[in-house]
Amino acid sequence: MSKEKLLLGGAGGFGRMVAEQAMLQYDCVFVDDGQPVGAEICGIPVVGGLADLPELRKEYGLLVVGIGNNRFRAQVYEKAKALGYAFPNIIAPSAYISPYAKLGCGCVVLQNACVQNGASVGNGVLLNAGTEIHCDAAVGDYALIYTNSVVRTGATVGNFARIGSNCTICNHATVPDGTDIPDGSAVHSEVKQWTF
């Protein structure tokens, strides 16, 4: 039985990590403005750039964006949504998503990440390896959480927020929209908006 076709937006570092997981389930190709058509990245062909999404829609119906820049990732998804693409979630086999959690569309959940009972994760979210989203926590649209960070019970991570590696967002703490939390931080309450 043949695999469904999937466009992967972005062939950079994060895009390649997404591709490793996506290839397990889909027949993948890249779209990337920085690579020539016909190039192969990790054995996956590049079929065009982002400007080619309208033409590629004739052959591909599914797209996942593996670009770490939250705002740019959102722009690509919005453009693709207007063209009629659908956005599956890419979930590593070793990740765990509770059947009682809510996961938006176009999310990437890498190895050993965990989304627990009652947690909610928005659209276009990237959860790196070892990330934990505890019960009743909420992660907004187009957020990015790096390796081994924990969002504790009842905590909220806003839209477009970026959480560095090895961070703890403590119980019922709030990370506002667009905030950048540096590596190794612990957030105990609502933080002022740090941006990069």
List where the protein language model places each region:
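Short alpha-helical
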Residues: 13, 71-72, 102
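Structural signal for interior beta-strand "rungs" in well-ordered beta-sheet cores
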Residues: 89-196
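Hydrophobic, well-ordered beta-alpha structural blocks that scaffold small-molecule cofactor pockets
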Residues: 1-56, 160
